[in-house]
Regions:
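Topogenic membrane-insertion module of multi-pass membrane proteins
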Residues: 1-44, 48, 145
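Alpha-helical transmembrane segments of multipass membrane proteins
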Residues: 27, 52, 56, 60, ...
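Early transmembrane hairpin module of multi-pass membrane proteins
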Residues: 56, 60-70, 96-104
Length: 176
């Protein structure tokens, strides 16, 4: 009942598990603070990076929930289903709605990534490609093969902080 009283944006925020996007926001803040420290911060690019990374993380959360649901991992007994809303598992949204959210959220993230590639240059391409790889393949097969935690370490560390630093500052730094 409460679900249907929410507008589309409220339902989307719940579906993407917006409460955990703080992890991504924190990595982006770190990249921005490092660029600010080195007096190379471009605020406009930082805002784009932050929005793009949060949308990519949101896309991954949607893919994660959809994949786990369709593979039978998520059901009423699944731990996360007991403390948080799983719209697909609880029948609050259809598979088509989930695919639509994945597509639209993913296209928005990719659009920002392509804009940053155009604005900052070709070094953004491998960062964008790595980000796409982890968004698409974190849930399966990486997590299934026991590589989920190392992937998280790579994504929220060097990729988001180091890559974010490059995009907002225009400089590559191995120290960062």
């Amino acid at each position: 009942e409460q679900w249907h009283q929410l507008d589309w944006f409220g339902r989307w925020l719940i579906s993407v598990r917006a409460s955990v996007l703080i992890m991504t926001f924190s990595s982006s803040i770190l990249a921005g603070l490092l660029a600010w420290y080195f007096s190379t911060l471009d605020w406009g690019l930082w805002c784009l990076v932050t929005l793009g990374l949060c949308l990519a993380h949101a896309t991954n959360n949607l893919i994660n929930d959809a994949t786990d649901y369709w593979r039978g991992v998520d059901d009423d007994r699944y731990m996360r289903n007991q403390y948080g809303v799983q719209p697909l598992t609880r029948g609050l949204m259809s598979g088509v709605d989930m695919l639509l959210q994945i597509g639209l959220t993913g296209m928005a993230a990719l659009g920002i990534g392509l804009l940053l590639l155009w604005l900052r240059g070709e070094l953004v391409l491998p960062l964008l490609a790595a980000g796409c790889f982890f968004v698409l393949f974190y849930t399966w097969p990486l997590k299934k093969w026991g590589l989920g935690e190392p992937a998280v370490l790579l994504v929220w560390g060097p990729l988001m902080v180091g890559g974010g630093f490059y995009v907002v500052s225009g400089q590559w730094s191995w120290l960062v």
